[in-house]
Amino acid sequence: MSASGLPFDDFRELLRNLPGPDAAALVAARERDAQLTKPPGALGRLEEIAFWLAAWTGKAPVVNRPLVAIFAGNHGVTRQGVTPFPSSVTAQMVENFAAGGAAINQICVSHDLGLKVFDLALEYPTGDITEEAALSERDCAATMAFGMEAIAGGTDLLCIGEMGIGNTTIAAAINLGLYGGTAEEWVGPGTGSEGEVLKRKIAAVEKAVALHRDHLSDPLELMRRLGGREIAAMAGAILAARVQKVPVIIDGYVATAAASILKAANPSALDHCLIGHVSGEPGHLRAIEKLGKTPLLALGMRLGEGTGAALAAGIVKAAAACHSGMATFAQAGVSNKE
C-alpha cells in the first residue's frame, strides 16, 4: 500500500510513469531487417512484430521463454442465471489444466510455451455486480499485485488468458461502462447462453452499469465495481510486464476487457501489447477497434484459456526467428537491389 494509505495509489503512480519503447533497439532492428535476403516489407506483419519485440525488450528480437498465464476467478453475478454452467466448472477446469487435458495444454505443447495457472480464491466469488461492487479497493489492489507475480519466474513473452464462469458477463459490463452503447451490443453467448439465459445476461449487464453509473469515470474504480479477480490480476500482469520489458499478447474478449481498463487510465498503457486474435464473441472486434489494435488471428474461437494468444505466440516466435536467423545479402552472396 502507498504512503497515502489508498490501495490504488501505487497503481495510479505506475500508470502515470510507464516506461516507453527503446528507440536504439528499434533502429538496430530496422537496420538489420533492411539487410536480410528479402524485398523490403515482404514479410509483412512479421517484420512489424520483430520491430515491436525489439522496441519493448530493448534488444534484438528473440523469444526464448514464452509463457501463457491463465487467471481463474468466480463471479457472484452468476446467481442471476447468466450462464448455463455452474460456477463449480471454474475449479474443475483449473484441475483439467493441471492434468494437461485442456485445449490450452495441447497448444502450449505444440508451440513450446510455458504455462502457469493462477487460482484466485475460487471458493469466494466476487460480489454480484447487479447488487454491489465486485471487490473492495483493497481486495482489487491486492489481486492486481498478485497478478504482477505472473512474470516472477522470468519470461520474455507473456500471453494473457483467463477462466471463469460468468466472466463474459463481466467483460460486457466493463465495455458498456467504458464505451457506452447498449448491453445488447456487448453481450454475447459466452459459454453458450441463449434464449432466456441470454436475456437475463443482457438484463444483468444493464442493471450493473446503471447501479454503478456514478462511479465509472475512474477506470480503476470501474474495475473494482464491475470486474473480477481475474480482471484485476490480468491488469496487474500487463502492468508488470511493461515495467520489466516483457511484450504481451492479449487473448480474447475477457482479457481484452481487462486491458481496456488500463488503456482508459493511460492511452499508451497497451503499446507493449498485441491482440492475439479476434474471438467469435460478438463484442470482441468492437472492443479491439476501441483500442486501435489489429488482431493477429481470426479463427472463430471463443474458448478463452489464453488459446488465441498462445496460437499467436507461434507467429511472434516465427517473426523473431526470421529476424535473427535469416542471412543478410552479404552473408548469402545474394545481390541486393541497386
Curated annotation (Swiss-Prot):
Keyword set, alphabetical order: Cobalamin biosynthesis, Glycosyltransferase, Transferase
Protein's pathway: Nucleoside biosynthesis; alpha-ribazole biosynthesis; alpha-ribazole from 5,6-dimethylbenzimidazole: step 1/2
GO-annotated molecular function: nicotinate-nucleotide-dimethylbenzimidazole phosphoribosyltransferase activity
Record's keyword annotation contains Kinase: no
Species annotation: Sinorhizobium sp
EC number assigned by the record: 2.4.2.21
InterPro entries from the UniProt entry: Nict_dMeBzImd_PRibTrfase, Nict_dMeBzImd_PRibTrfase_bact, Nict_dMeBzImd_PRibTrfase_N, Nict_dMeBzImd_PRibTrfase_sf
Family membership noted in the UniProt record: Belongs to the CobT family.
Catalytic reaction(s) noted: 5,6-dimethylbenzimidazole + nicotinate beta-D-ribonucleotide = alpha-ribazole 5'-phosphate + nicotinate + H(+)
SUPFAM superfamilies: Nicotinate mononucleotide:5,6-dimethylbenzimidazole phosphoribosyltransferase (CobT)
Chain's role: Catalyzes the synthesis of alpha-ribazole-5'-phosphate from nicotinate mononucleotide (NAMN) and 5,6-dimethylbenzimidazole (DMB).
Subunit structure: Homodimer.
Signal peptide: none
One Pfam family named in its UniProt record: DBI_PRT
Biological processes per GO annotation: cobalamin biosynthetic process
Stated name of the protein: Nicotinate-nucleotide--dimethylbenzimidazole phosphoribosyltransferase
Top-rank taxon: Bacteria
Active site: E305 (proton acceptor)
Keyword field contains Glycosyltransferase: yes
Lineage of the organism: Bacteria, Pseudomonadati, Pseudomonadota, Alphaproteobacteria, Hyphomicrobiales
PANTHER family registered for this protein in UniProt: NICOTINATE-NUCLEOTIDE--DIMETHYLBENZIMIDAZOLE PHOSPHORIBOSYLTRANSFERASE
